């Protein structure tokens, strides 16, 4: 065998060995706690989302979807308030320290929610809104000490804000009231 042929044979053998010892890809359900509904933190978050869903439904909003996920992030709840599509972020804090639950939704979180909404809107609109796209409002349900606080219109997507009541737009394109 020539030197080049020998090196090629060794390289192929090494590649075959690596292939044999390669770990199989982890399944999405392989994470700890997946069989029993997630980690304690995830189960707590799901409980608050369920409570927010029930509470908003009692306030007259109609549920459309829950836990919408895409590569940009997740939207906890999608609901309908008359002719407005409402995307809801649910937050909970045991204590009001560091500004509380509502204060934890800063500009970066709003940006992630807006990017997720931009990716998920076509599906939601196709499924629930024939015709012209509705105004899109972001609400926050913040649980502090177990009590819900509803922040209606915490922020709007600029291109989907209602025409009446606009007071301006900040540098990131958010409607400012």
Curated annotation (Swiss-Prot):
User: Cross-referenced SUPFAM superfamilies, in alphabetical order?
Assistant: Restriction endonuclease-like
Question: Known Gene3D superfamilies for this protein?
Answer: 3.40.1350.10
Q: GO MF terms on file?
A: nucleic acid binding
Region: Disordered, residue numbers? 13-43
Q: Name one Pfam family in it.
A: UPF0102
Q: Domain of life, per the record?
A: Bacteria
Matches recorded under InterPro entries:
Restrct_endonuc-II-like (IPR011335), tRNA_endonuc-like_dom_sf (IPR011856), UPF0102_YraN-like (IPR003509)
* Stated family: Belongs to the UPF0102 family.
By its UniProt entry, which HAMAP family does this protein fall under? UPF0102
Would you tell me the protein name for this molecule?
UPF0102 protein BPP4042
Organism equals Bordetella parapertussis (strain 12822 / ATCC BAA-587 / NCTC 13253)
